[in-house]
Swiss-Prot record:
PROSITE patterns linked to this entry: ATPASE_ALPHA_BETA
Gene Ontology cellular component terms for the protein in this record: proton-transporting ATP synthase complex
UniProt binding sites for ATP: G231, P232, F233, G234, S235, G236, K237, T238
Superkingdom of the source species: Bacteria
The name this protein goes by in its record: V-type ATP synthase alpha chain
Catalytic activity reported: ATP + H2O + 4 H(+)(in) = ADP + phosphate + 5 H(+)(out)
CDD domains from the UniProt entry: ATP-synt_V_A-type_alpha_C, ATP-synt_V_A-type_alpha_N, V_A-ATPase_A
A Pfam family per the record: ATP-synt_ab_N
Keywords, comma-separated and alphabetical: ATP synthesis, ATP-binding, Hydrogen ion transport, Ion transport, Nucleotide-binding, Translocase, Transport
Lyase found in the keyword field: no
């Protein structure tokens, strides 16, 4: 690591430090500030004066202390050993920090991101004389039940002079050498602010299934898409993201707790190790990386944490896997940008946020996508970002900037959350731009009439919402029977289809075949009941029909029993309203 001439601290304003005499320093270089060697990053240069955001508490730092540049950008180490890891915002493992400094993170502490002593069983997939590209696969390492592919750095490639034999190696051992003398290890470094290069971005065509009916049916997300979950405090953003992390169909989960309360991250750290992965039967943590950057940690590290998370996600994407990144919450990240911007005395824009807020958000969300990697594999990163608008005001700058970038908008409703309706996603205020893209997949893999059924359900819910306003004004007795049927069907759809019980082992997650079966049941009920009304039945007779209870219980039926249960309910629906006359 080349060391340049030291500069000195000129002024300190919270996490922002101005250093003079920084000859040879570059933008985004990592620096060590003060005698305690606090980690910082240069975010602006003016001649030999550097503006540094410090990722640790600057209390006690004084003017005149040394500032030393490392000539390296903020980078993460990518290799075996990251899965099941819990890091802070700049990829320092929290368990190692605790061993070194106790319950609180000591300032200036330096710990290795990956275990440098553990030996990994490396199996090469290339031979001397082969040509490898950047992000090319050199071999594999088993990590838990996961096959970790060892990649060349994206900016390195060429003909291989030597490849290590199959055996056990640490991440510092050389496992291959290029003809130009470049030595390749099991791990490599990559700067977090630079997107990892790919051959090309692909048109998304597969759904990212979450296990939540309201999302998978009404507002789907594509594999490689970006979604926003805005909502006021207490509406369930964190719980919704945790549920998607548990039951989503991604191969790898990266969960970034960015500026949220420490108790919420504690819940994740306690719950996730106990969760069983439905794919492997092992712990879910074995395919999860957690980045904990809570609200009481230094503000500047929040800004870095989302870049750290997306870089880890891109690394697994380059191995040909699908990755989901949960960012909770991007509002806290934007607040960190605002604080740093104000410390640097930049001109503020709306609500004090910097004018480049939209560009920064776009630079983050646009690193999502389905791609063809440099080595020819298909991979994807799906980003789901929570937004916490103050007081639930959706017109504030972070929400509006996020809306312009993301393709799915899952609006959380405090009223639904208070009524214990989970997930508390407002079906009349949410949307997905990916629905037309996925219609073909749904027709081929779920049901040929799936898009039409979804449209009918959407129409019924909208009609029910309009009729509820009438009911609140004049009462239900003023409605005709067919309108009361719409209200009853809407209630059933809300309570027995869109709502899920997160504590129930069966209902916490639902497959698409089961969702399709439920959709057909509820619409069959509406069609048969509507026909019965036309034949002279009354709405009271229909509401008291015992088949409604069976429809309500359908979502709690296990997947392996659902087909038979659904068939029985459909048969009963065909006969139960026949011959019922007024």
């Amino acid at each position: 690591m080349t060391q340049n001439k030291q500069g000195v601290v000129q002024s300190i304003a919270g996490p922002a430090v101005i250093a003079d005499g920084m000859y040879g320093a570059k933008m985004y270089d990592i620096v060590r500030v003060g005698r305690e060697r606090l980690v910082g990053e240069i975010i602006r240069l003016d001649g030999n004066t550097a503006f540094v955001q410090v990722y640790e508490d600057t209390s006690g730092l004084t003017v005149g202390e040394p500032v030393e540049t490392t000539n390296l950008p903020l980078s993460v180490e990518l290799g075996p050993g990251m899965l099941n890891g819990i890091y802070d915002g700049i990829q320092r493992p929290l368990d190692k920090i605790r061993e070194a400094s106790g319950d609180f993170i000591a300032r200036g502490i330096e710990v290795s991101s990956l275990d440098r002593t553990k030996k990994w069983a490396f199996t090469p997939s290339v031979q001397p004389g082969d040509t490898v590209v950047g992000s090319g696969i050199l071999g594999t390492v088993p990590e838990f039940s996961f096959t970790h592919k060892i990649l060349t750095p994206p900016d390195k490639g060429g003909k291989l002079r030597w490849v290590a034999a199959a055996g056990e190696y640490t991440i510092d051992d050389t496992i291959a050498e290029l003809e130009d003398g470049t030595k390749l290890r099991l791990a490599h470094y990559w700067p977090v602010r630079a997107p990892r290069p790919v051959q090309k971005k692909l048109d998304p065509s597969l759904p990212f299934l979450t296990g939540m009916r309201i999302l998978d049916v009404l507002f789907p997300l594509v594999m490689g898409g970006a979604a926003a979950i805005p909502g006021p405090f207490g509406s369930g953003k964190t719980v919704t993201q945790q549920s998607v992390a548990k039951y989503g169909n991604a191969d790898i989960v990266v969960y970034v707790g960015c500026g949220e309360r420490g108790n919420e991250m504690t819940d994740v750290l306690v719950e996730f190790p106990e969760l069983v992965d439905p794919k492997t039967g092992g712990p879910l943590m074995h395919r999860t990386i957690l980045i904990a950057n809570t609200s009481n940690m230094p503000v500047a590290a929040r800004e870095a944490s989302v870049y750290t998370g997306i870089t880890l996600a891109e690394y697994f994407r380059d191995q040909g896997y699908s990755v989901s990144l949960m960012a909770d919450s991007t509002s806290r990240w934007a607040e960190a940008l605002r604080e740093i911007s104000s410390r640097l005395e930049e001109m503020p824009a709306e609500e004090g946020y910097p004018p480049y807020l939209g560009a920064k958000l776009a630079a983050f969300y646009e690193r999502a996508g389905a791609v063809k990697t440099l080595s020819g594999d298909d991979g994807a990163v799906s980003v789901i970002g929570a937004v916490s608008p103050a007081g639930g005001d959706m017109s504030e700058p972070v929400t509006q900037a996020t809306l312009r970038i993301t393709g799915a908008f899952w609006r959380l409703d405090a009223g639904l959350a208070r009524r214990r309706h989970f997930p508390a996603i407002n079906w009349n205020g949410s949307y997905s731009l990916f629905t037309p893209i996925l219609d073909k997949w749904y027709r081929q893999n779920v049901g040929p009439d799936f898009p039409e059924l979804r449209q009918r359900i959407t129409n019924l819910l909208q009609q029910e919402a309009a009729l509820q306003e009438v009911v609140q004004l004049v009462g239900p007795d003023a409605l005709q029977d067919n309108e009361r049927l719409i209200i009853e069907t809407g209630r059933m759809l809300r309570q027995d289809f869109l709502q899920q019980n997160g504590f129930d082992p069966v209902d916490a997650s639902a497959s698409m075949p089961k969702n399709y079966g439920l959709m057909k049941m509820f619409l069959k009920f509406y069609d048969e009941a509507d026909l019965a009304l036309k034949n002279g039945s009354t709405i009271d007779e229909i509401i008291q029909n015992p088949v409604i209870e069976k429809l309500a219980r359908a979502r709690y039926t296990p997947e392996n029993e659902f087909a038979a249960y659904g068939e029985g309910v459909m048969d009963q629906l065909s006969t139960t309203f026949k011959g019922v006359k007024a």
